[in-house]
Amino acid sequence: MINSSRINLNSYFCSIFIVSIVVISLICSEALQIQEAKEPIRGHLTRVTIQNDNDYLLGIHCKSRDDDLGFHILAKGELFGWKFHVNFCYSTLYFCGFSQGQMKKGVFEIYRANRDFYRCANCTWKAEKDGIYGYSEDPVKGYLFYNWLK
């Protein structure tokens, strides 16, 4: 009689253990499927556009800590742009070196998350005679952000 109750008790615990393993496996499987369906955590999509509004060729070379966007030469009216997601810590920074001959040049912060995150999602910059103008979502009203260095 004692052996029979011990076998029943062992069988009972074994059944509970197997059912627990199956339930835990199903829960984990469901959680993994939900996680795979989610998109990775990223900031909002930001676009930066630089336009040459001068009569002279504009050389630009833009970089971030992780990306080198290369050197580009823009004629009057030409555009150069790129898009990116702002990082989780809001420390995204892009800077560009500009040159127009020997007289007009400079290296400027073109996108700094703690300055531009709420200012613009489509950030437009125009190189004009006196410097670099920044435009937010209003494409008509620009502000002189940077004077050309001499």
UniProtKB/Swiss-Prot annotation:
- The parts of the chain that form a coiled coil are none
For this protein's source organism, the top of the classification is: Eukaryota, Viridiplantae, Streptophyta, Embryophyta, Tracheophyta
Would I find Membrane among this entry's keywords? no
Q: Which UniProt keywords apply?
A: Glycoprotein, Secreted, Self-incompatibility, Signal
GO biological process per UniProt: rejection of self pollen
Predominant cellular place of this UniProt entry's protein: secreted
Give glycosylation sites per the record.
122
Species of origin: Arabidopsis thaliana (Mouse-ear cress)
Q: Which Pfam families match?
A: Self-incomp_S1 (PF05938)
Task: Report the InterPro entries cross-referenced here.
Answer: Self-incomp_S1 (IPR010264)
Which domain of life does the UniProt lineage start with? Eukaryota
Say which family it is in: Belongs to the plant self-incompatibility (S1) protein family.
Subcellular localization(s) per the UniProt record: Secreted
Q: What is this protein called?
A: S-protein homolog 24
Q: Name one GO cellular component term.
A: extracellular region
